[in-house]
């Protein structure tokens, strides 16, 4: 849990030991203005190292850490993909070499989150026999500019295949 500040030499150990890193992407964008001063240059190399963890073969469990951060998953997906806050700062993203792709970020909040909860046989994806918990949103998040991901709004929520919110 909270695998956000890891000694760089320990990053490969997650995959080697089958430890599942859990990340809260909005922590990086909330912490970006103070992390350098508080962690120092050496420790910052292993901070919020999502790309390094994925490249080492890890699944990443994404979450919000609500109520510390807001629960909206699109805030976290935006932060994971852009490494920017909701004002889209800094330009190019903070520690941009650690960005995730949109597919990786979506997996971290869906399939891989279910895997981390030992629930991947029941939830996390849409497939026959799964619970069919899903949302409809106001935009095609694959086609929208990454800087706009955080603005995504939920139009409808289905739980167990039944409409619960519209």
Regions found by a protein language model. Name each.
Residues 2:
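Histidine-centered active-site/metal-ligand motif
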Residues 8-12, 16-143, 147, 152, ...:
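His/Asp/Glu-enriched, well-ordered alpha-helical/loop segment
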């Amino acid at each position: 849990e909270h695998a956000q500040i890891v000694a760089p030499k320990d990053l490969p150990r997650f995959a080697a030991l089958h430890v599942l890193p859990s990340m809260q992407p909005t922590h990086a964008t909330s912490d970006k203005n103070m992390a350098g001063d508080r962690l120092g240059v050496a420790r910052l190399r292993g901070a919020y190292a999502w790309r390094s963890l994925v490249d080492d073969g890890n699944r990443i469990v994404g979450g919000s850490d609500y109520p510390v951060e807001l629960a909206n998953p699109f805030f976290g997906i935006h932060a994971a993909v852009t490494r920017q806050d909701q004002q889209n700062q800094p330009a190019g993203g903070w520690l941009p070499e650690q960005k995730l792709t949109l597919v990786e970020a979506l997996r971290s909040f869906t399939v891989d989150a279910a895997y981390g909860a030992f629930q991947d046989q029941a939830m996390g994806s849409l497939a026959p026999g799964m619970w069919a918990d899903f949302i409809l949103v106001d935009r095609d998040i694959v086609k929208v500019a990454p800087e706009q991901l955080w603005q995504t709004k939920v139009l409808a929520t289905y739980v167990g295949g039944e409409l619960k919110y519209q």
